Amino acid sequence: MQVILLDKVANLGSLGDQVNVKAGYARNFLVPQGKAVPATKKNIEFFEARRAELEAKLAEVLAAANARAEKINALETVTIASKAGDEGKLFGSIGTRDIADAVTAAGVEVAKSEVRLPNGVLRTTGEHEVSFQVHSEVFAKVIVNVVAE
């Protein structure tokens, strides 16, 4: 199924690209989320007429994401207290929700879906580097200091 992308989609393309995707992916994900429209003649003409407006909107979203990333980077360190054993091993773990709540409490609004933990949840005390994917192109990093209660 041919679609026109209205937003940058990972591993697919960017604004204005005409790509061929499976019908289910287009029908169930891209179109309902507003990331694409079917590539009909009417939609192609409509898109070309609104291209500048859509590019400006995309640039505005990117600028807002960069501003949020700067705020997150400015935090540098966030401390989370959790129960731990003698050897620094936590009872339980610290996941994306706990990190998002701690960063939000520090003053920057972050959704748990933006937290990236490449090595899985945090299970030990100490400092861990956590990255945030604020936008498909914008990343931020914070050091999470896990201390024992």
From Swiss-Prot:
Coiled coil: none annotated. Signal peptide: none annotated. SUPFAM superfamilies: L9 N-domain-like, Ribosomal protein L9 C-domain. One of its GO terms (cellular component) is cytoplasm. The modification N6-succinyllysine is found at residues 71, 83, 112. GO terms for biological process: cytoplasmic translation. Keywords: Acetylation, Ribonucleoprotein, Ribosomal protein, RNA-binding, rRNA-binding. One of its GO terms (molecular function) is large ribosomal subunit rRNA binding. The keyword Ribonucleoprotein applies. It comes from the Bacteria. The modification N6-acetyllysine is found at residue 89. The keyword RNA-binding applies. PANTHER family: 50S RIBOSOMAL PROTEIN L9. Belongs to the bacterial ribosomal protein bL9 family. Part of the 50S ribosomal subunit. In stalled/collided disomes (pairs of ribosomes where the leading ribosome is stalled and a second ribosome has collided with it) bL9 in the collided ribosome contacts bS6 and uL2, while it contacts only helices of the 16S rRNA in the stalled ribosome; the inter-ribosome bridge thus formed is different from that formed between normally translating ribosomes. One of the primary rRNA binding proteins, it binds very close to the 3' end of the 23S rRNA. This is Large ribosomal subunit protein bL9. The gene is rplI.
